[in-house]
From Swiss-Prot:
Organism in which the protein naturally occurs: Geobacter sp. (strain M21)
GO molecular function, one term: glycine-tRNA ligase activity
Catalytic activity: tRNA(Gly) + glycine + ATP = glycyl-tRNA(Gly) + AMP + diphosphate
Oligomeric and partner information: Tetramer of two alpha and two beta subunits.
Pfam families: DALR_1, tRNA_synt_2f
Enzyme class of the recorded protein, top EC level: ligase
Protein's cellular compartments: Cytoplasm
Name of the featured protein: Glycine--tRNA ligase beta subunit
InterPro entries referenced in this protein's UniProt entry, alphabetically: DALR_anticod-bd, Gly-tRNA-synth_bsu, Gly-tRNA-synth_heterodimer
Cross-referenced PROSITE patterns: AA_TRNA_LIGASE_II_GLYAB
């Protein structure tokens, strides 16, 4: 009969960012424990607050099934001597397995016959195994940072205060550090800090709410959402949507309630992004806006308790925010005393990266790269691109960005407008940081896009030049994000800029800094971009269609993306399977291709002439379709070759004895394969 497992780890406040991952890791760890022990189980539930992590598993088997275990020993040739007597190797293996040598069996494997010890193992009770599993699970939760406390030889995110562990309502006995497991949990630290008994998950959830704890983060999130909307309505405003903040705050509290506070309207002269950043990043406050989206002088904060006098909480939060905003106002006013262009010189004293020089040197490189892009793609904005690139990093040495790094670029735009720069240049200063996250907003203007592309490419190529290449677990310079940003901007804008030329232009500007051969760096950078492009496209289209196109060429990202989309649509045809098989057959026969011209005089079968004629006609139509970037039409034309290809393979022996005839037939198939290759490598497609 299946039973339920319940585990709660109660501790001091865990950082909000640790909790969701710990919940996911607990699920993975218990699955690993049960799977390794051959214990069947059902639904797994994980919950978490700043003070507790909860794991509940339903339908856990009472015991392991009995098992027959086979341990492989030495090969037969080493296990017996010429007279058939067991050798020391066989005797030692039997002794190690705890059985007599006569009980060993011969097992036939792919490598030959081997000795094996086959033993029956009686399954153990789950209740007997859990005291070993659960402390191991607790100790294996991989927190980003963990700590020891007192003199105990265990680690956890924060010191543990209690552990409740139950299987079928009975305590699972074990110790972790100085804590013995039991059947009691505890309520809210400030509102009901008393122990209460736990029987199972359902009973636990009921008791928690009675003791002012909401263990389910999704329920807490919805409570917070409803609370901030209620309070915003009372304040005659609207909550500025911020799902990331909502997610974070839901892991900061156990029993949320919302209160409304205000700040002086005088602070509204400071750019709204600064005010929002100060409230969100530093205080975890939700901002309020009016019906037109204008920022209101108010905020909503989430409290972890229900207070008798909310105004006490409000006043405290208002006082803290007032100090923050006063600092912001001071920096804003002081920064206005120095023109943005005057700050550019200060970048010479800011080290961008030890091997790549200062921020000023970086600016000079990507300014030239941005001008090159503008010259090739929109020459009318060259001067604006040059100006925006010159100024776009200057706000890094301003007081405001020094205090609030999150508003870099935004303040550059504000200061540029204040100094009388063109609005297009000012906007490009802010846009050049875009996108700031996957799927985020992209630069709206060509000016901002060119500066953004140039800056990001210089970052990627610069790091690769000096060996700072991302690994599977580390990407300290966010090069993957920069590469995806470049790809998304190019695709969104439709820029037909060969990626290889763009990379080479960037590397030429970095030649003096490079510690690796530039040709090697270029190959690595292009491989890096190919990986990002393939991953991005594979989220939208079948992976084999993506690989089929990207393996041929992805230098023109816009063209490659369009070909992938066309190929993905083309493969939905009912006759795609047979088409793919025919195309693959051609490609497999002429893997390297034959460069000799096709001679009709060497044809010995009518099928050869028919295929040659069909290829000639289709090649022209495909070329026209490719010029128009109508890749679906090109694929449709190529598909018309199938009858002629099928007839050719039915009637003609490609590998003829006559060398000239054989080469002529291979040349004919090479023409077809190269026509396919103008779009994709069909050998990579699944029928």
């Amino acid at each position: 009969m299946a039973k339920d497992l319940f585990l709660e780890i109660g501790c001091e406040e865990i950082p909000a960012g640790f909790v969701p991952k710990a919940m996911a890791d607990m699920e993975l760890l218990i699955k690993k424990e049960f799977d390794s022990a051959r214990i069947e189980y059902g639904e797994i539930v994980t919950l978490g607050t700043p003070r507790r992590l909860v794991l509940a598993v339903k339908g856990v088997a009472e015991r392991q099934p009995d098992a027959e275990l086979t341990a492989m020993g030495p090969a037969k040739s080493h296990a017996y001597d010429a007279d058939g007597n067991p050798t020391k190797a066989a005797q030692g293996f039997a002794r190690g397995q705890g059985i007599d040598v006569s009980q060993l069996k011969l097992v036939t494997t792919e490598k030959g016959e081997y000795l094996a010890a086959v033993k029956s193992e009686i399954g153990r009770e789950t209740a007997e195994l859990l005291p070993e599993m659960l402390p191991r699970l607790i100790g294996n939760i991989p927190f980003k940072k963990s700590m020891r406390w007192a003199d105990f030889d265990v680690r956890f995110a924060r010191p543990i205060h209690w552990i409740a562990a139950l299987f079928d309502g009975k305590v699972v006995p074990f110790s972790f550090g100085n804590i013995d497991s039991g059947s009691a949990s505890r309520g809210h630290r400030f509102m009901a800090n008393t122990p209460f008994p736990v029987r199972d998950l359902a009973h636990y959830l009921e008791e928690c709410e009675r003791h002012f704890v909401i263990p389910d983060p999704n329920k807490r999130k919805e409570i917070i959402r409803a609370e901030i909307e209620r309070v915003a309505k009372q304040a005659k405003g609207n909550v500025l949507p911020d799902e990331a903040l909502l997610e974070q705050v839901s892991y900061l509290v156990e029993y949320p309630s919302a209160v409304h506070g205000t700040f002086s309207p005088d602070f509204l002269v400071v750019p709204r992004e600064v005010l929002i950043t100060s409230m969100r990043e530093h205080q975890r406050y939700f901002s309020l806006v009016d019906d037109e989206g204008k920022l209101l002088p108010g905020f909503i904060t989430i409290n972890n308790t229900i207070t008798e006098d909310p105004q006490v909480v409000v006043k405290g939060n208002e006082r803290v925010l007032r100090a923050r905003l006063s600092d912001a106002r001071f920096f804003f006013d002081e920064d206005h005393k120095v023109r943005l262009e005057t700050r550019v010189e200060s970048l010479k004293s800011v080290v961008y990266q030890a091997k790549l020089g200062t921020s000023y040197e970086k600016m000079e490189r990507f300014r030239e790269l941005g001008k090159r892009l503008a010259q090739r793609l929109n020459p009318s904005v060259i001067k604006q691109v040059e100006r925006a690139a010159t100024l776009c990093k200057a706000d890094l040495v301003s007081g405001m960005v020094g205090e609030f790094p999150e508003v870099q670029g935004i303040m550059g735009r504000e200061y540029a407008l204040h100094d009388g720069e063109e609005p297009a240049v000012a906007n490009a200063i802010a846009e050049h940081y875009l996108p700031t996250q996957a799927g985020g907003e992209l630069p709206a203007s060509d000016i901002g896009a060119f500066v953004s592309l140039a800056d990001k490419m210089d970052t990627i190529c610069g790091c690769f030049c000096v060996g700072l290449i991302p690994t599977g677990s580390a990407d300290p310079y966010a090069l993957r994000r920069s590469a995806l940003g470049i790809i998304n901007i190019i695709l969104e804008k439709g820029y037909r800029e060969p990626l290889s030329e763009f990379v080479k232009a960037s590397l030429d500007l970095l030649a003096a800094k490079a510690t690796r051969p530039l040709a090697e760096v270029q190959k690595d950078v292009l491989d890096f971009f190919r990986g990002r492009f393939v991953n991005l496209m594979a989220d939208r289209f079948p992976s084999d269609a993506v690989e089929a196109v990207a393996s041929v060429s992805f230098d023109d990202l816009v063209e490659a993306a369009a070909k992938i989309e066309a190929l993905a649509g083309f493969r939905n045809r009912d006759d795609f399977g047979p088409l793919a098989v025919a195309f693959k057959r051609v490609c497999n026969i002429v893997k390297d291709g034959v460069d000799t011209p096709v001679s009709a005089e060497l044809f010995q079968d009518a099928a050869e002439g028919e295929l040659h004629q069909a290829l000639t006609q289709v090649s022209g139509k495909v070329a026209d379709a490719l010029k128009k970037a109508d890749y679906l039409a090109a694929l449709t034309e190529i598909a018309t070759l199938k009858p002629a290809v099928d007839l050719f393979f039915e009637k003609v022996m490609v590998m003829a004895d006559d060398e000239r005839v054989r080469q002529n037939r291979l040349a004919l198939l090479t023409g077809i394969a190269r026509l396919f290759a103008s779009l994709a490598d069909f050998s990579r497609l699944s029928p």
